[in-house]
Curated annotation (Swiss-Prot):
Keywords linked to the UniProt accession: ATP-binding, Cell cycle, DNA replication, DNA-binding, Nucleotide-binding, Nucleus
Organism: Schizosaccharomyces pombe (strain 972 / ATCC 24843)
UniProt protein name: Replication factor C subunit 4
Lineage: superkingdom: Eukaryota
Gene symbol of the encoding locus: rfc4
Record function comment: The elongation of primed DNA templates by DNA polymerase delta and epsilon requires the action of the accessory proteins PCNA and activator 1.
Length: 342
């Protein structure tokens, strides 16, 4: 009796737990019309979906702008109910050496599947630029042999890492970075659907940290809601683990006024929070671009200094000394010549 009661209680408890999808998947477009940005390229995919004759495709562009989603939407439009049987998707988490090309991909290409008239099986290779050169050479031959029944769609960040023989067999589509307005509109739609409490500076912070990456923006939005319940600038930067633009702005303002001691003190405060040199320099670059109070010529000089320091840091010299030298050079570039007269 007691066992039955306890099991029913546990059953109710388990049923009450709501497992929510990540918003990236929950709000992933399922038709081409819902994809944000890159209208011209999407229009070409719509023509392919309408005519039904899909060529081999290479879609390149930065992460989080809809490359894989576009291919999945195209596959759904072409195959309809036969999607599950007619599509093989391999992403970066799958082993994709020569053995996979020779065995798994070849086996799928040989498999007989009932598809709508005039349609082909589709093999989707996400992050194809991470495939080894040997695997790409093996893939080239597979593409040739099974082109009558199978089409390949490759998504990559850099198309130049795809070997030339594969590029020559494919139609290459290049996706551009999403604009801030496009990212903002999708975030507003999600906030409305999820009844999210947000502020304007919170949305601005999401856009700034995402840098055109829609996936990053949506992930940061969900993480901020889950962690704090309110999407404002401070909470977003805590979730994104990036230096606050307010602190960066204060440091750069001190540089602009030639107050080196205050600027170095602000830098030390940011450094003590544990941020890397790359994070600090990257955010300095973002903030300087938005500082309208600085004359354009001075801004260009500051951006030049920040860019040179960024290059040094990427070579491995990620020290506070490098950042301090940058701050001093920025302050010096804003000082008047008479300040140097002894």
């Amino acid at each position: 009796m007691s066992n039955a009661v306890s099991s029913s209680v546990f059953g109710e408890k388990n049923n009450s737990v709501a497992y929510e999808l990540p918003w990236v998947e929950k709000y992933r477009p399922i038709v081409l019309d819902d994809i944000v940005g890159n209208e011209e390229t999407i229009d070409r995919l719509k023509v392919i979906a309408k005519e039904g004759n899909m060529p081999h495709l290479v879609i390149s562009g930065m992460p989080g702008i809809g490359k894989t989603t576009s291919i999945l939407c195209l596959a759904h439009a072409l195959l309809g109910p036969a999607y599950k049987e007619g599509v093989l998707e391999l992403n970066a988490s799958d082993e994709r050496g020569i053995d996979v090309v020779r065995n798994r991909i070849k086996a799928f290409a040989q498999k007989k599947v009932i598809l709508p008239p005039g349609r082909h099986k589709i093999i989707i290779l996400d992050e194809a630029d991470s495939m080894t050169a040997g695997a790409q050479q093996a893939l080239r031959r597979t593409m040739e042999i099974y082109s009558n029944t199978t089409r390949f769609a490759l998504a990559c960040n850099q198309s130049n890492k795809i070997i030339e023989p594969i590029q020559s067999r494919c139609a290459i589509l290049r996706y551009s970075r999403l604009t801030d307005q496009q990212v903002l509109q999708r975030l507003l739609n999600i906030c409305k659907a999820e009844k999210v409490n947000y502020t304007d500076d919170g949305l601005a912070a999401l856009i700034m940290t995402a840098e055109g990456d829609m996936r990053q923006a949506v992930n940061n939005l969900q993480s901020t809601v889950a962690g704090f319940g309110l999407v404002n600038g401070e909470n977003v930067f805590r979730v994104a683990d990036q230096p606050s633009p307010v602190a960066i702005h204060a440091m750069l303002t001190a540089c602009q006024s030639g107050n080196i001691d205050v600027a170095l003190e602000k830098l030390q405060g940011i450094w003590d929070l544990g941020f890397s040199a790359v994070d600090i320099v990257t955010n300095m670059f973002r903030v300087v671009k938005t500082m309208d109070s600085i004359p354009e010529f001075s801004r260009l000089e500051m951006l030049k200094e920040i860019g040179q320091t960024h290059m040094i840091i990427l070579e491995g010299v990620q020290t506070l000394l490098q950042l301090s030298g940058l701050v001093c050079r920025l302050a010096k570039s804003q000082m008047k010549p008479e300040s140097f007269i002894i």
